[in-house]
């Protein structure tokens, strides 16, 4: 009778152990290692308890591996999608490049069609004729362009021998000098010293036609009136 009471009192331990074992086999068991150990340590044999603990540990590992496997699958799916997108992008770019390369030859053929490898001499002569006409037109235009004449403005100081020199006669002699490109300008008498005056006269000369040295020599040739000739000012116009 005492033994029956013991079995009845301990019956729930066996039922709890059996339920835990069945849940483990079905994969629905959520282990509580501390509670299970405390509950079953006094009921099940040590070997059975060790086997149950091993099964629980294995179930935990399987569940962890399953979770890791799901995460890994998500990563793989993402990488596959990325690779697929890159592949499509590369194929699109390669298609455009290939299309451009294939489209280039016709343009080259059109250019080749414009080139006459067997052109006649008449075309060459025509080109030379056009070139010659253009050169002639340019030369004619250039020849009609007004040429800039370089000129200089000169101020001369002409000194007499003394105060008795006829300055009016000296000026007339100087102005009598005529040269192509020489134009006489204004003049005046400028006191020098001791009653002596010098003739200061201006003129404009074309540089290409009149030599200043030659002009001075012509003035100095009037020895009866002229002692010396100096260039007081010389300016390019």
From Swiss-Prot:
GO cellular component: cytosol; eukaryotic translation elongation factor 1 complex
UniProt keyword annotation of Protein biosynthesis present: yes
Pfam family for this entry, one: EF1_GNE
Stretches with biased composition (Acidic residues): 109-120
Signal sequence region: none
Keyword check for Protein biosynthesis: yes
Alphabetical keyword list: Elongation factor, Protein biosynthesis
GO molecular function: guanyl-nucleotide exchange factor activity; translation elongation factor activity
InterPro entries recorded: eEF-1beta-like_sf (IPR036219), EF-1_beta_acid_region_euk (IPR018940), EF1B_bsu/dsu (IPR049720), EF1B_bsu/dsu_GNE (IPR014038), Transl_elong_EF1B/ribsomal_bS6 (IPR014717), Transl_elong_EF1B_B/D_CS (IPR001326)
Region (Disordered): 97-120
Quaternary state and interactors: EF-1 is composed of 4 subunits: alpha, beta, delta, and gamma.
Record family assignment: Belongs to the EF-1-beta/EF-1-delta family.
PANTHER family given in the database record: EF-HAND AND COILED-COIL DOMAIN-CONTAINING FAMILY MEMBER, ELONGATION FACTOR 1-DELTA
Function: EF-1-beta and EF-1-delta stimulate the exchange of GDP bound to EF-1-alpha to GTP.
Protein name per its UniProtKB record: Elongation factor 1-delta
């Amino acid at each position: 009778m005492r033994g029956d009471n013991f079995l009845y009192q301990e019956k729930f331990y066996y039922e709890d152990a059996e339920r835990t074992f069945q849940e483990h086999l079905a994969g629905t068991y959520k282990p509580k290692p501390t509670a299970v150990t405390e509950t079953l340590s006094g009921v099940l044999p040590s070997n059975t308890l060790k086997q149950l603990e091993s099964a629980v540990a294995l179930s935990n590992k399987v569940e962890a591996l399953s979770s890791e496997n799901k995460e890994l699958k998500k990563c793989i799916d993402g990488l596959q999608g990325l690779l697929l997108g890159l592949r499509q992008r590369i194929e699109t770019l390669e298609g455009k490049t290939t299309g451009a390369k294939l489209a280039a030859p016709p343009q080259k053929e059109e250019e080749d069609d414009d080139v006459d490898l067997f052109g006649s001499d008449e075309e060459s002569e025509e080109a030379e004729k056009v070139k010659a006409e253009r050169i002639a037109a340019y030369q004619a235009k250039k020849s009609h362009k007004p040429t800039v004449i370089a000129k200089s403005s000169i101020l001369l100081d002409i000194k007499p021998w003394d105060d008795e020199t006829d300055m009016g006669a000296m000026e007339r002699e100087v102005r009598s000098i005529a040269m192509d490109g020489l134009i006489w300008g204004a003049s005046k008498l400028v006191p020098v010293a001791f009653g002596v005056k010098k003739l200061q006269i201006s003129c404009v000369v074309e540089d290409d036609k009149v030599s200043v040295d030659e002009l001075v020599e012509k003035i100095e040739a009037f020895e009866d009136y002229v002692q010396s000739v100096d260039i007081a000012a010389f300016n390019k116009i």
